[in-house]
Amino acid sequence: MSSLAAGKPADIEANKKLVREFYEMAFNQHKPTEAAKKYIGSKYIQHNPHVPNGSEAFYSYFEKHFKENPKAHVEIKRVLGDGDLVVLHLLSKENEKDRGRAIVDIFRVENGKIVEHWDVIQEVPEKSANTNTMF
């Protein structure tokens, strides 16, 4: 597990930029292979139970996903950085009729590459017990 020690502001901003660019290329441009080769390190630890470790497993999984869901899109709501960690809070939809999922993705960056990933995914419900949004 990574340290949450404070990093240099310039490093944190560079990590946030790197993760945002990776996400845009992989999930909105639907280029997971290109994104993985450009932004993921040679050792990639995956904590999502549906995706194996390694960059090849990542892009194989998402190439198939985008063939099945060609209108899939994400909207990044927040980007937070802490040391070598970058956190994205986003809305993910498979198509324009989908209510979507609220996702929190956590990435660990090392030497300018993404080397580890965690996520938490929650369906956006049809009805809510309150008037707040998930974002």
Residue spans for each PLM region:
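C-terminal and inter-domain tail/linker signature
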Residues: M1-F135
